[in-house]
Amino acid sequence: MSSPAERLRRDFGGDIIEPGTGEYESARSAVFASGSPAYILRPESVGDVQAGVRFAAGAGLALSVRGGGHSFPGFGTNDGGVVIDLGKLAGVELVDKERHLVRIGGGATWGRVATVLAPHGLAISSGDTKTVGVGGLTLAGGIGWKVRKYGLALDNLVAVEVVTADGALVRASAAENPDLFWAIRGGGGNFGIVTSFHFVAHPTTDVFFGRITFPASEAGSVLRGWVEHLRTAPEALTSIANVANPLAGGPEAPVEIHVAFDGDDPALAAHAIDPIRRLGTVLDDDVALRPYADTLVDGATPPPGIRFLTRSAFVGKESVAEVLRIVAEVGASERPPFIAVRSVGGAVSRVPDDATAYAYRRAELMVVTMTAGPEPVVAAARPALDAIWGRLAPHVDGAYANFLATAAEDDVAAIYPPETYRRLVAVKHRYDAANLFTGNHNIRPR
């Protein structure tokens, strides 16, 4: 009887990279985490993915799945296990021009998607970074520059093909395996490896995009006015406020209001954006008409040894004033973290709460803090961050999985309210009762 490794070499048609081989050093780590896996598999077909999953299960090895490799907890690598790197399954195809249906491989990045769709005048509500993978972002939500108009990335998903823990290929949609389709949209990589995503794209023109900056001393009034404006602004406007950017002066850093207006009409854009310009003393304003693909930034790979401590939570309308007050105070403190306040609402909030496993539909804002540096620096900053989040805790809800640097049980509890978690457990038990897929914010099967 052949061993799992022998069967892998027989059935797997892609690259098998092991320690000591030429590509291993460049392939063993993800963007935010280093690892030393025993096998790195680069499938060239869905059959290869199935063979890789069966191998990991049969050999009893930890399994990690890598798309873009951008997860802050480092889900895209491990020590001593198997990494399935989907980078060769990166096709982007417009399969139905009339209905704007797009099929995307599980290893594609959002930069590639935007570039391929641009000549067709189409785009998909995605994230804001070119090198981020379609899979990791979509399976947890997908909050980007079109979120208020077209919803989360996962709200534009109509079907997926998934390799489950037994190596089977399963299609999930509203009509086929709807329990899995519900869970996939927000439940992360808990249920299998998505080899193909089917999205509805939307017509797009060039967009008005850029940054308007104000003095740090005006943070409180600018943030309050910004939120008030967003409550009545057209949903074509999505915006992010950055406070206390350590790379731009920390407490002295200008408040950065990033805006994206989905449309190329100058009058409509001015109607949406000019009220923000009137919120305070404008230091800089580089808003201009740009191709949508150019709104996505290049994702930088940090130097070895740099760690990121990222936390997030959602803010309901009733708590916005107090949260913004705390954010402004923290931003003015001696050594603040990077703080971002992202607008959501709009199309996101029109989806029923229980329609997907992404749970926090009623939120008006999302708050994110981030600290980066060598491990000792990040460790030293943790008590201050804990204190900040202690102040925020009574006024915020949940967490967004894509902006969490850890994956402990309390993180999972924050991402999924009890009823959502209960439903996810049932789906996990059906499709992965042995919990093969643990490289995620893990749902434990009952």
What function would you assign to each model-found segment?
Residues 1-446:
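Soluble FAD-dependent oxygen oxidases
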